[in-house]
């Protein structure tokens, strides 16, 4: 399959002042976040590279060349990825269109044993030695679990893992997003750890439900009258049911040394490709002069609403409401 250029879609809420420059439905490749353990990005020659699939629970170990993988029937999926080190309100989350091969096809060709056994691990290795893993059944539960060869219609850039990388919806990258991949092994879950577990990060890494205010930017000044507020929320594989915003007088919050829970109201959500992507949201606010504190929270499609209590990113992802302050004149 040859790369096909993709015209990135226009966001439903791009009319919000400043939003399109900060967040779009599909993240341009050059703007997609980068977090790696590799100080120097591996330069892989696709003519000599291969991907091997093996392990204790594989009956027929197999390997594939880059050309063999490109010549297969490829699928295209839109998936949001995020980093476990992303703080509340942070920008280490992006959305792209990925093209590649479902890993289940490759595992089945290798004769994987008992794919529903949660004591078996999908364990991957990069050419630079990075390793990570997740429970094998997650590759088979219907989520996008892909060996990606293209990103937004073009071959993977070197920075994003050329010639191939993993894209697993709903898992933080530290347990799933192996770039420059060279090996997939089906191993035991217990006793086989990836790069980050000895360094204090959790063995499992499901993405937590999150939301963010992108505009107006915290600390900015806006004119009174109609002000459009916008941002994103995400809970890949589960999906976002509702996003709410609370806007309070900053002086009252300071005087009470607490927030009120009386001001939450739902916002408008944009359409999404699937539950594996982030969703843009907007709220039109009749702003009056003063200093205002904004908070946002999301509820996913299981009915779970974000916790207001701050939790640091380590060891398994940040929690809390993204909070901003703006001045209206």
Model-predicted regions and their roles:
Residues 2-329:
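Structured, non-membrane catalytic/scaffold regions adjacent to prosthetic-group chemistry
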